[in-house]
């Protein structure tokens, strides 16, 4: 990790402003780091060398003229779910082979408008379906962290595994990511990085490949809370092209850092103490409670009675929406096309060859729960449960609770190619046990590293906030970060 790539976004921003470094030097340092490390970590599926250099050159020119944007010259990685004009956008699926969109997603357009530099597209679980980044057509991503005294490869979490691994390994200053059931927060927790899923509607979904439209939200993964706040300010906007986009001013999230949490009411949900939760997770949770208490926050016990139904309801709603969204991939207009004896056969052959195993599984579950005989029994019921989950949170917030503290994941990062998890999808789905509820309720949630386990692997805590009160999350997460310190993996790649 070079001196330049070790800079946080906030530090790089200050050095660029002071003309102590140039955007070109910073970008070249990241491109060299990617070229040296990507064979080992597999975080990038496309590296845009020429585009990055020309964007950095334009940034240097704007800085020289005194016209620098909020992210001028900051090199970022982009999850392969965001449309980037003329650049590989395949949701890491075989079915989108060769697809290069003619348009730019709103999130990336916002970042480029603020002067950020694109380093390339980041690996992810296919169509964002997965918790380990093992379902990608481009192969798994390796976590930059390893257990003490071990050379075994670990997963970086998913679906934004490439984003989290690239940030942790200093292969980008920060990254875009998406979260449908935990895909920002779980990989952030597994890699010692910070990830925030904003309130549903805070960040535009336009130009982002859809998985489950009522749950998907884009957000940043960054090295620390300040960097996440800086990125989120640029990513969030009102967008008339997204009907779920909310017309609320975007606050200066960075300004929330350092504000006192004295008197802030933090809820601890008793339902999150799940059976079989490792002692190290319980210990971490207690540590987080103490950090906030020491900073003057008031800790209160709360109840979210419908928590246990969140995961099963999520795995009905998300596949149902996915089966509908993924019906558009048929090999006719773009992507992979496998010839067939007639049009119906061509559709079948293309979809059979183009989708991976996990995506097929979820399409089939979704089609099943939406089918005539089962719609009421499954889908309708799951939506009713979702309403009850939302009400649980509304009741808690009505009692004056400002934020809720929970573990981010039920364990540290697990081994790559774990046979038990590979053969039992439900065990894999349990990785999202603490995160899916936030998507079901449309609330903001942040994962912040809070310590290392006995094997030296990072563990994260999650803070859940009221709708559109991300500032409170940044404020409280910053307190945890200041108390716990920061965590960087030892370089092996």
UniProtKB/Swiss-Prot annotation:
What cellular component terms from Gene Ontology apply here?
A: glutamyl-tRNA(Gln) amidotransferase complex
Q: State if ATP-binding is listed as a keyword.
A: yes
Can you tell me where the transmembrane regions are?
none
Q: Which InterPro entries match?
A: Amidase (IPR000120), Amidase_CS (IPR020556), Amidase_dom (IPR023631), AS_sf (IPR036928), GatA (IPR004412)
Q: Which domain of life is it from?
A: Bacteria
First-level EC class: ligase
Q: Which reaction does it catalyse?
A: L-glutamyl-tRNA(Gln) + L-glutamine + ATP + H2O = L-glutaminyl-tRNA(Gln) + L-glutamate + ADP + phosphate + H(+)
Enzyme Commission number: 6.3.5.7
State whether keyword NAD applies: no
GO biological process: one example = translation
Keyword line:
ATP-binding, Ligase, Nucleotide-binding, Protein biosynthesis
Single GO MF annotation: glutaminyl-tRNA synthase (glutamine-hydrolyzing) activity
Active site per the UniProt annotation? 79 (charge relay system), 159 (charge relay system), 183 (acyl-ester intermediate)
Assembly: Heterotrimer of A, B and C subunits.
Q: Which family does it belong to?
A: Belongs to the amidase family. GatA subfamily.
Q: Which NCBIfam families match?
A: gatA
The function of this protein is: Allows the formation of correctly charged Gln-tRNA(Gln) through the transamidation of misacylated Glu-tRNA(Gln) in organisms which lack glutaminyl-tRNA synthetase. The reaction takes place in the presence of glutamine and ATP through an activated gamma-phospho-Glu-tRNA(Gln).
Q: What is this protein called?
A: Glutamyl-tRNA(Gln) amidotransferase subunit A
């Amino acid at each position: 990790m070079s001196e330049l790539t070790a800079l946080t976004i906030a530090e790089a921003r200050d050095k660029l402003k002071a003309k102590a470094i140039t955007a070109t030097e910073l970008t070249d340092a990241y491109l060299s780091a990617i070229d040296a490390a990507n064979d080992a970590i597999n975080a990038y599926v496309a590296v845009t060398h020429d585009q990055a250099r020309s964007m950095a050159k334009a940034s240097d020119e704007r800085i020289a003229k005194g016209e620098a944007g909020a992210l001028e010259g900051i090199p970022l990685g982009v999850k392969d779910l965001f449309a980037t004009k003329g650049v590989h956008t395949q949701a890491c699926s075989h079915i989108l082979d060769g697809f290069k969109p003619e348009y730019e997603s709103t999130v990336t357009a916002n970042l480029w408008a603020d002067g950020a530099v694109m380093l390339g597209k980041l690996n992810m679980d296919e169509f964002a379906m997965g918790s380990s980044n093992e379902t990608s057509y481009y192969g798994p991503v390796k976590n930059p962290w390893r257990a003490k005294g071990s050379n075994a490869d670990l997963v970086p979490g998913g679906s934004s595994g490439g984003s989290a691994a690239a940030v942790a390994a200093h292969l980008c200053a920060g990254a875009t990511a998406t979260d449908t059931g935990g895909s920002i927060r779980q990989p952030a927790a597994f890699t010692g990085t910070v990830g925030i899923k904003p309130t549903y509607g805070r960040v535009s979904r336009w130009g982002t490949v859809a998985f489950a439209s009522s749950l998907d939200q884009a957000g940043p993964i960054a090295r620390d809370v300040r960097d996440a706040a800086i990125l989120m300010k640029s990513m969030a906007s009102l967008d008339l092209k997204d009907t779920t986009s909310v017309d609320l001013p975007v606050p200066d999230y960075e300004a929330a850092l350092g504000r006192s949490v004295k008197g802030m009411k933090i809820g601890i949900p008793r339902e999150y103490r799940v059976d079989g939760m490792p002692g190290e997770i319980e210990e971490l949770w207690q540590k987080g409670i103490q950090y906030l208490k020491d900073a003057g926050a008031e800790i209160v016990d709360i109840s979210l009675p419908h928590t246990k139904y969140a995961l099963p309801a999520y795995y009905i709603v998300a596949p149902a929406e996915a089966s509908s969204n993924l019906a558009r991939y048929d090999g006719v207009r773009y992507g992979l096309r496998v010839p067939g004896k007639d049009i119906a056969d061509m559709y079948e052959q293309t979809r059979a060859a183009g989708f991976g195993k996990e995506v097929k599984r979820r399409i089939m579950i979704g089609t099943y729960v939406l089918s005539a005989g089962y719609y009421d029994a499954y889908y309708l019921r799951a939506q009713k449960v979702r309403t009850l989950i939302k009400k649980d949170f509304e009741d808690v917030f009505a009692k004056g609770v400002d934020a809720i503290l929970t573990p981010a994941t039920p364990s540290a990062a697990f081994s790559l190619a774990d046979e038990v998890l590979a053969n039992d999808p439900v065990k894999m789905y349990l990785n999202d046990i603490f995160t899916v509820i936030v998507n079901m309720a449309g609330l903001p949630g942040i994962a912040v590293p809070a310590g290392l386990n006995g094997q030296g692997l990072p563990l994260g805590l999650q803070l859940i906030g009221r709708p559109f009160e991300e500032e409170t999350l940044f404020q409280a997460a910053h307190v945890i970060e200041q108390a716990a310190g920061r965590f960087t993996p030892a370089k092996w790649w």
